[in-house]
Curated annotation (Swiss-Prot):
Domain DBINO: 476-601
Record region (Disordered): 137-311, 393-452, 1456-1489
Keyword DNA damage part of the UniProt annotation: yes
Any Gene Ontology biological process: DNA repair
Protein name: Chromatin-remodeling ATPase INO80
Coiled coil location: none
Positions with biased composition (Acidic residues): 140-164, 214-291
GO MF terms, alphabetically ordered: ATP binding; ATP hydrolysis activity; ATP-dependent chromatin remodeler activity; DNA binding; histone binding
Name of the gene encoding the protein in the UniProt record: INO80
Provenance organism: Saccharomyces cerevisiae (strain ATCC 204508 / S288c) (Baker's yeast)
Length: 1489
């Protein structure tokens, strides 16, 4: 029971208290009288009341401690299942050890702990049954705080041991069953005793009599309410713990208790509501109030000290709960924390402000036995308290006044008070007659008549408090009856069901534990079996592991043996392959050596064979060996030695030579089968085997003189023909390969009477060149040009379709010239012929062995094949193999072997600068020398000038750099991969065969477009505004309109046709339509507005004011300012004074025109000044020609330098003439507007006079030309740029937006001034279109040749370039204009963009650097720094190095100059000796002018 209940109850019963204590208060009308109160009596009443109140508090404390003991007992019972489960788990841990000694130790420890626990439990039971108050009273009251804390700690340790002993007491063994039952009986007895004590105490509380009759009874009821609430909260907390423990236990048996989960959730919901009510607290802002708190503390010190220890110990017991994760051996503070968490789980504090007066014991100090009480008053009680304090103050003042007032009679006052009190007492006795029996039963009686908290109140206030309390009391009980009763009933039922379930589980666990002891022997047997199985399993695993290790070791040994055998086999195979390679090389070398001695290639090239080579081959003569073909796959390379293999190689070489000779002889026999018998003696002359080693002179039928090296080439070709061997004439471009091949044909015709048929296959661009060369050097040969459309070729095929056709001097044709495309198209017809000699010009066209032209040409029947090429190797060694296999299929039959021999080493040397195997290179040269003849210009042609190569490096412009970065960001493939693809060897050949490679090449092409010119992506368009205009019609349209009677066209022509006749229109005399455009909008101005606003009137005086200003206020008017005009006349010599007035009123533009036209009055000598004479001479000068240019040098220079640079700053989007305004009945407005806009004098001066008008003026009207009005005053550049709103793309911007074009523009100016003629090579025809626009803008004479040019046009273009020196630039595509044509008229070659293949560029530049060139040739190559073009150029240098290594055996140093052009167009020139085998360009000190 709390003090708040007592206070609230006192408010209720204050009226009864006032009735029973009539002497305590007076009537309402006599309250102002002063009463003499005995101080001693009042103090006695207060002391009695306070002692009574303290006794009540002591009784409440005792009852609460007993209740806490009871709750503690319930908590222990509800936690048994969880504790037993934990003990079972620990008992299982003891059974892990299989030794009996460990078991005995565990059991001995268990027995020892159980005995100690029984002893502690007995002490605890005696402690609970003892009278705690007597025990505490025996304690020393003056003991210090440290001793009290020690006692509390001892009590906590005892309780911890009690809990642990309770846990261990129920653990494990069946022999402890009796002890468990006994302890439970003791607990049940103690719980019964506690319950009985609680009931007795409650009954005793009901019988207690307090002050003011029913006051204490109601107070007890209120106290019971609080105790009930506390008990409910404690029960709720216990139920929470029970539910949590049950949830933990139910997790082990989910199948049995699955239906109890929903019930537990409902319990948790109920607990949350109850816990919120339990946790309610008072406002912290209210002040504590107790009038006699010090006295109460003194009075309650003795009684409260008796219950101090019990309250502390029991509060610790109720706050400790066992967590399922805490073992019985855990520390007590840890267990306490876990129990607090369990109690507060899922609880939410809900603080509600009390609506009634409350009193709570906030603190109790056991040292000085002080009890702190917090009283929270509601608003009404606060006001009442203030009023009582004021009344007490006034009471004291009255008492002091009474002491000082001697005139008053104290006895009268006492009588009056006694009378009033007796009257009130009688009234109270009548009202409380029914409750007299109950009052007699009360223990205490009130005699002091004071309020419960020592204050007074009247009956009205007491009744108000009573009503308020009744309403609150009724509301609380209604809420409890409506909400809490059903909850508590369900909660009790659930607790009972859970408890029964826990009991059942506990019993089952106990039975299970009992059975474990009975099945001990069985478990030992089972353990033996388990151990046996485990041993067998471990043994099996051991043997398996042992076998696996042995197997792995055996496999390892076998693997090592196999690897060793494989290694030995690889070494053996490598030796075998080396022998095979040596065999093939020896075979080829012997064949080449024999042929080389026959045809003397070394002597023709100017080289001598080394002594080692001669020494190595002198022992074997393949001509003396019997031809025997040894199958390459049948040779045993393992058993035969090197000498035997060498002999077999010699036999194969002899066999190859015999087959070649037999083939040539068979071809000759078949060709001469139809000869007459008397010519049989000449067969030996034509037989190649009997010609012998002779020196061939130049054929007489050859209409030219061969140079010395060309005559040697003729001898070499003749020897090849005699031996029946094919060859490659690989002289450097420009040394006359064409004339040497023609001389061979002349040699065969003159010396061997072999007139054909000969086949010449050449690129399409050189067809006419070959025809011209053959007809020029061999006029006796009949040429068949085989090209054209299908019908033309069908007619040409009739020449060789004749039966028994014999080729002699009178044959229909001797040489057929065709292109590679025609060979592929008409291969079926050409294969039927047997050709004596087939010449392939620009043989790099068949560099791919997979192409259709290579396969078709290889299938042709011909005695000898001659390949003409200046670059036998362009990209890789595979191209060289393709040419060698074409001329010698029997020797060079496998590309893989050739690649294994030479390609890998040489190409890797060129790419990575690795060391080259000189022996291997020497053998390659030995193989190639008999079949290939190559001379370079510097060795054989001393009169040919040098060739200087200059690389011009430019930086990207701003627009190009942005486009380049955008392309790099949009391409998903890595940019480095694209650059590698750009530099790949097979890029130009096989890229189209692969989709991925083609995508990369397309990406590369986009980057190259950016480097060339950004306009290759998008051109700037012509910009013009929208014209909202009706245009005038020309004469042809008017003629058609008159013929068709189309009045609409004539009416819209804006021309006055009244003076025109149909004859004039038909003759076409009227063609001047200047200012003929009109606005489609016409506006008719009302006449009323025109008269009021435009015509002069009293409202509109604008015209009058202007006239008045120009006449009256003009200082140059002679009538108003005569003296000034006279003074000016004397100064200027002007006789007329009105002339000043006229000049001042004439517009400035008209005055300029009049002054330009010169003086009108030529009779006046005063105007014959020098200035007028000059003007007259200038005016009479012709408008065009040398004289006009000389007279207007300054004007032309000014216009060219300044006016041409002026461009429009604003371009309108729409243009329209002024709206036409008409006034009905008046033409003044229209005429004034037209005169203002289209003044005839100004229009005539700014524009030119039409030719027909000039004719009419001079011829028909007889006006001299010198009297024609001055025209064309508006400068031509301004007239071009500002006379129309149409904006053309700026050519200056077009030039400056490309780095290459800007540099080329500067370069061409320099070359033009120095008299050079330029060849410019391109890769893109679209770029050639842009270049033509540029050359037209700069007015350079140029011609163009590309792949779209026709054959006959190509011949004419080359002829014009060679013969017409006025042509400054020749635009060519590298593929079409770089082969087989002679362009020696040019001495400068510019590569705007380079080709994939460096040899293509080399052939293109040799179009100018060849025989016939007398000047030094300079080659410029435009490159963009930091782009993909640099990567392509580096790769091209590597390819050139491969060519140099293969053809000459070493790298050739070339003089290269590099010009670096920066952003400010400054040039940094570097010149030095550049070795192709080195990366980069070495800087030099010299600069290029």
């Amino acid at each position: 029971m709390s003090l708040a209940v007592l206070l609230n109850k006192e408010d209720k019963d204050i009226s009864d208290f006032s009735k029973t204590t009539a002497g305590k208060s007076a009537k309402k009308n006599s309250r102002e009288r002063v009463a003499d109160v005995a101080p001693t009596r009042v103090l006695d009443k207060k002391q009695a009341y306070l002692s009574q109140l303290n006794s009540e508090f002591n009784r409440i404390k005792r009852r609460d401690s007993i209740e806490q003991l009871y709750q503690d007992w319930k908590f222990i019972n509800l936690q048994e299942f969880e504790l037993i489960s934990e003990w079972n788990q620990q008992s299982k841990d003891w059974q892990f050890d299989n030794t009996n000694d460990s078991q005995d130790l565990h059991f001995k420890k268990l027995y020892r702990d159980m005995s100690m626990i029984n002893k502690e439990w007995a002490e605890y039971q005696s402690f609970k049954n003892a009278n705690l108050s007597d025990i505490i009273n025996e304690k020393d009251a003056d003991e210090d705080e440290e001793d009290d804390e020690d006692e509390l700690e001892d009590g906590e340790e005892d309780m911890e041991e009690d809990e642990a002993s309770t846990g261990r007491h129920t653990n494990g063994k069946s022999m402890r069953g009796n002890g468990i039952q006994k302890s439970r009986k003791k607990d049940a007895a103690a719980a019964a005793a506690i319950g009985k004590a609680i009931k007795d105490d409650q009954t005793h509380a009901d019988t207690v009599v307090t002050v003011n009759g029913d006051e204490n009874e109601d107070g007890n009821n209120g106290e019971d309410e609080d105790n009930d609430n506390d008990n409910e909260n404690n029960n709720d907390n216990d139920n929470d713990n029970e539910n949590e423990n049950d949830n933990d236990s139910d997790n082990d048996d989910e199948e049995e208790n699955g239906e109890e989960d929903e019930e537990e959730e409902e319990i948790e919901d109920l607990d949350e509501e109850d816990f919120a009510a339990f946790e309610e607290q008072d406002d912290n802002d209210d002040e504590d109030f107790n009038p006699d708190v010090e006295k109460r503390r003194k009075r309650s010190s003795s009684s409260s000290s008796s219950t101090k220890l019990s309250m502390n110990s029991l509060s610790l017991i109720t706050s400790k709960k066992i967590n399922k994760n805490i073992t019985i051996n855990s520390d007590r503070p840890k267990i306490v924390r876990e129990l607090i968490k369990m109690c507060n789980k899922n609880k939410h504090q809900k603080i509600k402000k009390r609506r009634f007066t409350n009193c709570i014991v906030t603190d109790y100090n056991p040292i000085d036995s002080k009890l702190n009480i917090k009283i929270t008053l509601k608003q009404y009680h606060v006001k009442r308290l203030k009023k009582l304090i004021n009344d007490a103050k006034r009471e004291r003042e009255r008492e002091e006044a009474l002491k000082n007032n001697v005139g008053l009679d104290g006895n009268d006052l006492d009588n009056d008070e006694d009378g009033s009190e007796s009257h009130k007492r009688r009234k109270l006795n009548n009202n409380t007659a029914n409750g007299a029996d109950d009052a007699n039963k009360r223990k205490f009686n009130t005699r002091h008549g004071l309020p419960t908290y020592g204050m007074k109140m009247n009956a009205k206030e007491a009744r108000a408090i009573q009503r308020h309390y009744d309403n609150t009391y009724t509301t609380i009980w209604k809420d409890m009856a409506r909400k809490d009763s059903t909850k508590m009933s369900r909660l009790v039922q659930q607790i009972q069901s859970i408890r029964s379930t826990n009991f059942r589980k506990t019993s089952s666990l106990c039975a299970r534990e009992a059975k474990k002891w009975q099945s001990k022997n069985f478990k030992q047997i089972k353990d033996f079996q388990t151990r046996a199985r485990r041993g067998i399993r471990e043994m099996s695993n051991f043997w398996k592991k042992n076998e696996r290790e042995e197997r792995d070791l055996k496999k390892k040994i076998e693997k090592e043996a196999m690897e060793q055998a494989k290694k030995e086999e690889e070494e053996k195979e490598s030796k075998r392959q080396a022998k095979k390679l040596n065999f093939l090389l020896t075979q080829t070398e012997l064949y080449s050596h024999f042929i080389g001695r026959k045809i003397k290639t070394n002597e023709l090239e100017g080289n001598n064979v080394s002594s080692n080579d001669s020494e190595s081959q002198k022992n074997i003569d393949i001509s003396a060996l019997a031809p025997n073909k040894n199958d390459f796959h049948a040779i045993d390379f393992d058993n035969e030695n090197d000498e035997q293999l060498r002999l077999r190689a010699a036999e194969n070489a002899s066999n190859a030579l015999a087959e070649t000779r037999a083939k040539a002889k068979q071809f000759d026999d078949h060709a001469n089968a139809h000869e007459e018998e008397e010519e049989e003696d000449e067969l030996n002359f034509q037989n190649p085997t009997s010609l012998g080693e002779i020196t061939i002179e130049q054929p007489k039928i050859l209409a030219c003189t061969l140079k010395e090296y060309q005559l040697k080439g003729l001898n070499w070709l003749a020897n090849l023909y005699d031996q029946g061997i094919n060859g490659i004439l690989a002289d450097e471009m420009g040394l006359g390969k064409t004339v040497q091949s023609i001389s061979v044909l002349a040699h065969l015709a003159e010396n061997h009477n072999i007139w054909g048929p000969f086949l010449v296959v050449t690129p399409a661009s050189t067809l006419h060149n070959w025809v011209n060369e053959i007809s020029k050097f061999l006029p006796q040969f009949k040429i068949l040009p085989y090209w054209g459309n299908a019908n033309d070729r069908k007619v040409l095929r009739k020449f060789w379709d004749r039966k028994n056709l014999r080729y002699n001097k009178n044959a229909p044709f001797h040489v057929m010239v065709t292109s590679y495309q025609m060979v592929v198209t008409d291969a079926n017809y050409l294969q039927k012929m047997k050709w004596q000699y087939m010449i392939l010009d620009e043989a790099q066209a068949i560099k791919s062995s997979q192409s259709s032209r290579w396969k078709n040409l290889l299938s042709f029947h011909c005695r000898n094949r001659l390949l003409l090429t200046g670059t036998p190797i362009q990209n890789s060694m595979q191209e060289l193999w393709a040419l060698l296999h074409f001329i010698m299929p029997s020797l060079f039959d496998s590309h893989d072997e050739f690649n294994e021999w030479f390609s890998k080493d040489i190409e890797s040397h060129a790419e990575a600068n690795t060391k080259l195997n000189q022996q291997q290179l020497r053998r390659l040269h030995m193989i190639l020398k008999p079949f290939m003849l190559r001379r370079v210009k510097k060795n054989v042609q001393s009169e040919l000038g040098d060739k200087i190569e200059i690389d011009v490096l430019c930086d990207l412009t701003q627009r190009q750099a942005k486009l380049y970065q955008v392309l790099k960001s949009q391409i998903s493939t890595n940019y480095d991969a694209i650059e590698n693809a750009a530099t790949n060897d097979s890029t130009s050949n096989s890229a189209s065969n692969s989709g991925s490679d083609q995508n990369l090449i397309n990406a590369v092409m986009q980057f190259r477009k950016v480097c060339n010119h950004p306009d290759l992506f998008e051109r700037a368009d012509v910009d013009s505004p929208f014209s909202f205009t009706t245009f005038g019609k020309t004469t042809s349209m008017l003629t058609a309109s008159v013929a068709n009677n189309n009045s609409s066209v004539i009416s819209n022509s804006n021309m006055n046709l009244s003076s025109m006749s149909s004859n004039n229109i038909s003759n076409g005399k009227f063609t001047d339509l200047i200012y003929s455009s009109r606005n489609p909008i016409k506006y008719s101005l009302p006449r009323l507005i025109y008269e009021d606003l435009i015509l002069p009137n009293y409202n509109n005086d604008v015209d009058i004011a202007n006239k008045l200003k120009n006449v009256k206020f003009n200082i140059f008017n002679p009538s108003t300012n005569y003296e000034l005009c006279l003074f000016l006349s004397k100064l200027t010599g002007e006789p007329s004074l009105n002339e000043f007035f006229r000049v001042s009123t004439t517009p400035l533009l008209k005055r300029v025109i009049e002054r330009t036209n010169g003086p009108k009055n030529t009779d006046s000598l005063s105007f014959k000044t020098i200035t007028q004479e000059l003007l007259e001479v200038t005016r009479n000068a012709p408008s065009e020609g040398v004289m006009a240019s000389l007279l207007n040098v300054e004007k032309h220079a000014y216009e060219r330098e300044y006016l041409n640079c002026i461009q429009r700053g604003y371009h309108p989007n729409v243009s329209a003439p002024p709206v036409t305004i008409e006034v009905l009945g008046s033409s003044h407005v229209t005429n004034s507007i037209n005169n203002e806009l289209f003044d005839p004098l100004i229009s005539q001066a700014l524009s030119d006079i039409p030719a027909i008008t000039q004719y009419n003026m001079h011829v028909k009207k007889g006006i001299p030309v010198e009297d024609f009005p001055k025209t064309g005053l508006f400068p031509e550049p301004l007239n071009k740029n500002f006379s129309s709103n149409i904006s053309m793309p700026s050519m200056d911007r077009f030039i400056t937006e490309s780095a290459k074009l800007r540099k080329l523009d500067e370069l061409l100016v320099k070359l033009k001034s120095e008299g050079h003629r330029v060849l410019i090579y391109f890769q893109m025809t679209k770029m050639m279109d842009l270049m033509e626009e540029y050359l037209t803008y700069r007015q350079y004479n140029h011609i163009r040749l590309d792949g779209s040019s026709k054959l006959e046009d190509r011949r004419d273009l080359v002829h014009d370039w060679q013969t017409n020196p006025e042509i400054f630039v020749f635009l060519l595509s590298t593929r079409a204009g770089g082969l087989g044509i002679n362009l020696t008229a040019a001495d400068t070659v510019i590569f705007y963009d380079s080709d994939w293949n460096p040899t293509i560029d080399s052939q293109a530049m040799d179009r100018a650097h060849r025989l016939g060139q007398t000047r030094q040739v300079t080659v410029y190559r435009l490159l963009v720094r930091g782009t993909i073009e640099e990567r392509m150029r580096d790769r091209a240098k590597q390819k050139e190095q491969v060519q140099q290594v293969v053809m000459e055996g070493k790298t050739q140093e070339k003089n290269i100059k590099t010009i670096e052009v920066g952003e400010n167009d400054s040039e940094v020139t570097r010149e030095g000796s550049k070795s192709i085998s080195q990366d980069g360009i070495k800087e030099a000190a010299s600069a290029l002018a």
